[in-house]
């Protein structure tokens, strides 16, 4: 039986990845920080909490990482732990940098020194591209991050490449573009929209958002974790862009959600109102980022050709999943 350890197992990607690995017969270890409150709601909804063995880990302490690996003896290590909210990274740049960079260095050092046969996956991000130099973005596109989050992730990405090339480790990075799901955190715009609209049906409180013209390449997290697994099943390690290759504006996303909920609306500029003139969606300057990234659209051709990765979802099915989940949680 293969064994895998997942940091960030209680997050969106961690939950879906754990479910995938369990379905493939893995023994799954969920690594978590001690005293984090053990927020398992995603794992509970996915019905897998009892199938995961949890281990406490401190990515800031190499000795602790070594002890965990001594105990688990994993075949694969998926590092998904991160402070992943871009907006918060401007408010907490130090915490974001330490969390998203130092931990990766410590993991790679322990693997290099003691467990060089472990296959390692690092969660990189399209936010590393930032001020883009070409569209669509691919594995060779130059990075120009526009947030502390993107900067920290770029460091970890290059570090993973360096350890692969310098020490012959099986270390891969997945440059994942935006991926959503019913398990997305409520601080992210897609989930803020789906949950907010479901609540609007009940209380009429409008959803406040930032720049509705921002474009994103949105996929489904369930598809993207399969790509993570596929990377570690190859004969040689490499880095891959995981994306849909299509973009939509936040306004597009809103319209599809309103249609899914069968809400009648009229739209003028960045405002959406119902038939009585009441706000459904309105903008608030406080939700606009200090530095917005340019058009992010990924080129997934390498992953499709080399990994034979085939996403099962499109934007419509993603939105349907998210809306139905929030209706079930909060009631229509």
Roles of regions detected by a PLM:
Residues 66, 133, 184-185, 254:
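A short local structural element in Rossmann-fold oxidoreductases
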Residues 91-92, 148, 183-187, 294:
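Short, solvent-exposed loop/turn segments at secondary-structure boundaries
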Residues 178, 182-185, 213-217:
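Heptad-repeat alpha-helical coiled-coil signaling segments
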